[in-house]
Regions:
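Extended charged/polar low-complexity repeat regions
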Residues: 1-594
Length: 594
C-alpha cells in the first residue's frame, strides 16, 4: 500500500533521475469525494512473501503492480513479468471518470458522457462503436452499422429491470419480474412465454415451465444445495451431501450412481470416486487444490507437477510416458517436450495471441491477427489461408490455400443468411423470429424446416414435398424418423426403457399407396447391471455381446456363444493385441507414445 505523499515523492525522484521537469503531483488528495472520504491510500503492488511449498525461493518481483495518476486514479496495471497489460485515461475535469482504456496490443476504447455522467458514445477504432440515448424508462443503443436496440425498463435504483427489448430486426422480447426483482417470465419474439417460479425466501428457481406446458422441478436442502431435479420427461437427478455440505453421491436420471469420498475435513476436493460399475478412482491434491496424482480403476497412476503459479509443468503417465511444459515470465506456454526430447515451441505477440507453433522437426505454422485479435492469416505446411471480417467481427470472406474464395453474409442479428462457396454455388438461409432455420436455398433447391411448440424439428420438405419426418412421445423423446426412398416410406422407430435408455430400433418399409408393410427388422439393446450397454440383439440372429472391464474399456466381443475378438491393453489402456480366431494383430508404441 502507498500513500499519496509516497507516490508524489516517487514521481519527483523519477523525474530527477530522468533529467525531466517534475509534473504536478500533489502530496494530498481532496479529503472527500461523492463516494466518501478518500485517505489517498492505494494498492500499488502485491508481493509473495511466504510460500510453504517454496520457502527459500520467493519471486524477486511483485505478482502485480498498479500505477496511479496524480489524482489517485488507476492508470496502469503490470503483470508479474513487469509488462503493462492495461491502461486507463480519465476526464480532465471530472476526477475518476474513465474516458479511455486499452489492453496492451489492442486498440484504445474511448467513451463520451452527457452532463449527467452517463456514457453516450463508446468508440472502437477496430470494431463496433455504439451510441446511447437515454429517455425516461428507455435506452436506445445504436451501433456503427446503424443497428438499433431499445431497452425498456421498470423500477428504480437496484430494482430497475429491463422488461422489454426491441431488437434490430424489429422483433420484441419481454421479461416479467416480481416485486423484489426476481425473474418470473420471459416471452420470446414469437410471443411464447417461459415461466420461472422462484422460492419465496431464497429466490432459487423451483420450477420452469416452457411454452408447450412441460415443466422441470428443482428441490434444495436447507443449505440451498440442489438435491433433486426432475426434467420434463419425468426422469430425476438426485444429489446427497455430507454434514460439511460436500457432494457425496449423485444419481443420474438413468439410475447410475457416482459416489465421492473425502479424506480431509478441510477440503472440498474428493480423494476418491466410485462410478456405477464399481470402479474406483483416487486423487491426491496439493494444499492449493492442484491435482497431484490420479489413479484409475486398474490402479494405474498419472502424476502431475506444477509451478508456484499453479501452471502444470509435467505429466507422468504409466509406460514411462512423460510430458514437460515450460512457460515464459507472463505465464504463457512456450514449450512442450516429451520423454524422447522432442520439443514443440510456441510464440506470441505483445497482446498474448499465439503467433507460431514450431514442431520438433522445425516446421513452423503461423497465425497473423488484426488489431482486435482475430486471426486474419494462417500458414500451415507452407499453405496459407486468410480471413476477412466486417466491423462486427463476422467472417465475410475466406480465402483457401489455392486462392479460391468463400463469402458470407449476415442479417442484423448476426445470423448467417448467405454463403457463396469456392465452387461459386450460393446457399441462402432464412430464420424465424426466434432464430430457427425455416428455409434454405441451394441453387434453386428449396428446403423448408418445421418445428413443434418445443422447438423440436418435426418435418422437412424439399421442393414442396415431405422429405423427412420426426415424431416424439409425451416425454419429448424421439420415437420415429421417416423418409421417402424410391417411393417407399422408410421409418425407424425407437423404444426406450424406464431409464430413458435406447431399448429397440424397429426399421420398417411401407408401400407408398396402400401403406402395406413390406419389410421390417428390429434390433434390441440390453445393458448390464452396472448400466453399460453390453448386448445388441438383431432379429433372427445371435446376439452380439461385448465384454468390458473397469469403467467400460472394451475387452472382447462375441456372437452368440462364439468369441469374435479379444483385446489386450497396456497400462494406459491402449490396445496392444487383437485376437480374432487364429489371427492376431499386434500394436506397439514408441517411448513417446506414438
Amino acid at each position: 500500500l502507498t500513500t499519496q505523499a509516497q507516490r508524489a515523492e516517487e514521481a519527483r525522484q523519477q523525474a530527477i533521475s530522468g533529467g525531466t521537469e517534475p509534473s504536478a503531483f500533489p502530496d494530498t488528495l481532496p479529503g472527500y469525494t461523492e463516494y466518501g472520504r478518500d485517505n489517498g491510500i492505494r494498492l500499488s503492488a502485491v508481493w509473495l512473501t511466504h510460500d510453504p511449498e517454496y520457502p527459500e525461493n520467493l519471486p524477486a518481483a511483485p505478482l502485480v503492480r498498479y500505477g496511479w495518476t496524480p489524482r489517485g486514479e488507476l492508470a496502469v496495471v503490470y503483470d508479474r513479468s513487469g509488462k503493462q497489460v492495461r491502461s486507463f485515461t480519465y476526464d480532465d475535469k471530472y476526477r475518476g471518470r474513465m474516458v479511455a482504456h486499452r489492453h496492451t496490443g489492442r486498440p484504445e476504447i474511448r467513451y463520451r458522457y452527457d452532463s449527467d455522467g452517463r456514457v453516450t458514445e463508446q468508440l472502437n477504432p477496430a470494431g463496433l462503436s455504439y451510441t446511447y440515448q437515454y429517455e425516461k424508462d428507455r435506452i436506445t443503443i445504436t451501433d456503427s452499422l446503424d443497428r438499433r436496440e431499445v431497452l425498456h425498463t421498470q423500477g428504480e435504483a437496484g430494482l430497475k429491470r429491463v422488461v422489454k427489448k426491441e431488437h434490430a430486426d424489429g422483433s420484441v422480447t419481454q421479461s416479467q419480474f416480481d416485486a423484489v426483482g426476481r425473474l418470473r417470465a420471459q416471452t420470446d419474439a414469437a410471443g411464447r412465454t417461459t415461466e420461472y417460479s422462484p422460492d419465496v425466501v431464497t429466490g432459487l428457481i423451483t420450477r420452469i415451465t416452457t411454452p408447450d406446458g412441460r415443466a422441470s422441478a428443482f428441490y434444495y436442502n436447507h443449505h440451498n444445495q440442489l438435491t433433486s431435479a426432475t426434467g420434463p420427461d419425468g426422469l430425476e437427478l438426485r444429489r446427497e451431501y455430507d454434514e460439511l455440505g460436500r457432494l457425496i453421491q449423485e444419481t443420474a436420471p438413468d439410475g447410475d450412481i457416482t459416489r465421492y469420498r473425502y479424506d480431509n475435513p478441510h477440503s472440498d476436493l474428493p480423494c476418491a470416486t466410485e462410478d456405477a460399475t464399481g470402479s474406483r478412482k483416487t486423487m491426491t491434491w496439493s494444499r492449493y487444490g492442484q491435482l497431484l496424482s490420479f489413479t484409475d480403476c486398474s490402479g494405474y497412476v498419472t502424476r502431475y507437477d506444477h509451478d508456484r503459479f499453479g501452471q502444470m509443468t509435467a505429466v507422468h503417465r504409466e509406460e514411462g510416458l512423460s510430458q514437460y511444459r515450460a512457460y515464459d515470465s507472463r505465464g504463457q506456454l512456450i514449450a512442450v517436450k516429451d520423454t524422447q526430447g522432442h520439443e514443440t515451441r510456441y510464440e506470441y505477440n505483445i497482446a498474448g495471441d499465439l503467433t507460431a507453433v514450431i514442431a520438433p522437426d522445425g516446421s513452423r505454422n503461423g497465425t497473423q491477427y488484426d488489431a482486435w485479435g482475430k486471426a486474419v492469416r494462417t500458414t500451415q505446411g507452407g499453405l496459407t489461408r486468410s480471413m476477412e471480417y466486417d466491423a462486427a467481427g463476422r467472417v465475410i470472406r475466406l480465402t483457401s490455400e489455392n486462392g479460391s474464395h468463400t463469402t458470407f453474409r449476415y442479417d442484423v442479428l448476426d445470423r448467417l443468411i448467405q454463403e457463396t462457396g469456392f465452387d461459386g454455388r450460393t446457399q441462402r438461409y432464412h430464420h424465424d423470429l426466434t432464430g430457427k432455420l425455416i428455409r434454405s436455398e441451394d441453387e434453386g433447391l428449396v428446403t423448408h424446416w418445421y418445428y413443434d411448440e418445443a422447438d423440436r424439428l418435426t418435418h422437412r420438405t424439399v421442393k414442396g414435398e415431405t422429405a423427412e419426418q420426426w415424431q416424439y412421445d409425451e416425454r419429448g423423446w424421439l420415437t420415429d424418423i421417416s423418409h421417402i426412398s424410391e417411393g417407399h416410406r422408410v421409418a425407424v422407430h425407437y423404444g426406450y426403457d424406464s431409464k430413458g435408455r435406447l431399448a429397440s430400433e424397429h426399421l420398417t418399409v411401407h408401400h407408398p399407396q396402400t401403406n402395406e408393410l413390406l419389410w421390417q427388422h428390429e434390433t434390441r439393446h440390453a445393458y448390464n447391471a452396472q448400466g453399460l450397454a453390453n448386448r445388441c440383439i438383431p432379429d433372427s440372429l445371435p446376439a452380439v455381446e461385448w465384454l468390458t472391464y473397469g469403467s467400460g474399456w472394451l475387452a472382447g466381443m462375441k456372437l452368440g456363444d462364439t468369441p469374435l475378438v479379444d483385446f489386450t491393453r497396456d497400462r494406459l489402456h491402449r490396445e496392444t493385441l487383437r485376437s480374432f480366431g487364429r489371427y492376431e494383430l499386434t500394436t506397439a508404441y514408441t517411448p513417446a507414445g506414438q
